């Protein structure tokens, strides 16, 4: 569509893939979507209930799109696929599967990599509940080892500073990374003291007294701005040295957390190679430091590490995943015989 972050149905992309493969829709064994909408809706409801009555306006704004479309995504996808293929409304379609968000990230990273064994780290804003996860890939098996849940999120922390420095959330994070070299990391201690507690294994907890994103329309609150002594920068304003230093500070904190998570992942897996996925994996400065200072001999980053790359899991998902779920709803094992090699693209 040539529209950045286009949220519409990817008809052109589907047409292209089918054309390149020389097949039509009826020849597909499955269509896989990279999210579980009902789990995500569960997270939204639990979060709004936990913060009520705060966030009521945000709740009212969010619900229409869920009640009209997102909760019925399977029906929407079937309708769009039939229209795309020019099929009768009752014509059969390939089976429709839904993976968990971080499951999609991990599969897209490991199964597209050149490795037969690797640690896999997924870092982003949030999927259904998970915000950070560690996996171990071996041959055709991909096993989750650890994960961190919303609202504690490295991606959302970085997005909060993206917003504070005048850039658009979920779009301008690369600009914040580019701004960082022009500043000095003077506020690293402030961030660690007030905003985030980080453990040696890389797990962390955000001080939610400073953030509004769980139920608000903004990422941060007035307490966050007061911490740095200035309001959020407007989009058209020239950043002063304060904002340059803040950008440098959150970039350094992000790099240090990524390094700790990587060291823990290496301890858990014993692997010498690492695959990365999730939006945070697009932070090339952190990736460079991870390659130089991290515990892994080789690093492979999913080229479309953000949500756009979730579709890469599809070719491996149907044959390679058997999900066992414990009482807490977390996937604890994903392993099954599979004839798709781990390096398949």
Q: Would you name each region that the model predicts?
A:
Residues 1-318, 323, 329, 342-345:
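Short acidic/glycine-rich loops and adjacent helix/strand connectors
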Residues 329-333, 337-339:
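Short linear/disordered segments characteristic of secreted peptide precursors
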């Amino acid at each position: 569509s040539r529209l950045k972050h286009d949220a519409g149905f990817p008809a052109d992309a589907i047409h292209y893939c089918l054309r390149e493969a020389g097949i039509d829709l009826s020849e597909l064994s499955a269509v896989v979507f990279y999210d579980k909408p009902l789990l995500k809706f569960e997270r939204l409801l639990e979060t709004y209930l936990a913060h009520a009555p705060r966030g009521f306006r945000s709740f009212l704004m969010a619900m229409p799109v869920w009640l009209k479309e997102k909760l019925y995504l399977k029906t929407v996808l079937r309708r769009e696929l039939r229209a795309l293929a020019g099929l009768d409304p009752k014509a059969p379609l390939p089976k429709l599967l839904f993976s968990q968000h971080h499951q999609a990230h991990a599969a897209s990273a490991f199964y597209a990599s050149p490795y037969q064994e690797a640690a896999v780290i997924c870092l982003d804003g949030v999927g259904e509940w998970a915000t950070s996860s560690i996996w171990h890939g071996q041959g055709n098996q991909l096993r989750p080892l650890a994960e961190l849940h919303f609202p504690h999120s490295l991606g959302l922390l970085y997005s909060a500073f993206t917003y504070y420095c005048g850039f658009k959330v979920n779009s301008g994070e690369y600009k914040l990374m580019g701004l960082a070299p022009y500043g000095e990391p003077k506020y690293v201690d402030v961030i660690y003291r007030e905003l985030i507690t980080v453990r040696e294994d890389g797990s962390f907890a955000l001080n939610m007294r400073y953030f509004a994103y769980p139920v608000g329309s903004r990422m941060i609150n007035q307490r966050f701005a007061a911490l740095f002594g200035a309001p959020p920068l407007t989009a058209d304003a020239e950043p002063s040295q304060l904002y340059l230093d803040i950008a440098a500070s959150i970039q350094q904190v992000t790099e240090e957390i990524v390094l700790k998570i990587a060291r823990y992942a290496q301890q858990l897996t014993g692997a010498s190679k690492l695959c990365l996925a999730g939006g945070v994996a697009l932070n090339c400065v952190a990736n460079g430091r991870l390659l130089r200072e991290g515990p892994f001999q080789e690093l492979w980053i999913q080229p479309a590490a953000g949500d756009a790359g979730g579709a890469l899991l599809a070719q491996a998902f149907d044959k390679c995943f058997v999900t066992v779920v414990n009482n807490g709803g977390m996937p604890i094992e994903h392993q099954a015989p599979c004839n798709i090699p781990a390096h398949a693209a």
